[in-house]
Amino acid sequence: SGQKVCYGDLKHSCYKIAYFQDLSRRVGFQEARQACEIDGGALLSLESEAEQQLIENMLQNLTKSGSGISDGDFWIGLWRSGEDLATTACPDLYKWADGSISPFRNWYTDEPSCGSEACVVMYHQPTANPGLGGPYLYQWNDDRCNMKH
């Protein structure tokens, strides 16, 4: 299930957002990746500021439309191997699950924190109090891959 939006003029012509209010239906990174592949797609690779803005606008419109989307982060296709790796090189080790080589990143302040957090979510917490980097909306955060989003 999920909201699907298609565009005729973009490299990635269709986007599908799957959001579950029921916490028991949320999944970890690998489960989300497999669900996308079974559905004929892939976890999102954000390759430019323009594409990031497109996704932000999509989420804003879905939130306004009464679709039930509220607080809940979204897995994107950025990850790194070596979950216990905490070196200064860590931010450069993230790669896109679909093989995209885009260097575009939209990390939240002080992210990625690395260590055991090797998979990446896009923040979507409109009701959360802002942190040092502002509202937790649309920036990226590394998280443990088994967390349910």
Task: List the predicted regions and their residue ranges.
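Extracellular, disulfide-bonded carbohydrate-recognition/adhesion ectodomains
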Residues: S1-H149
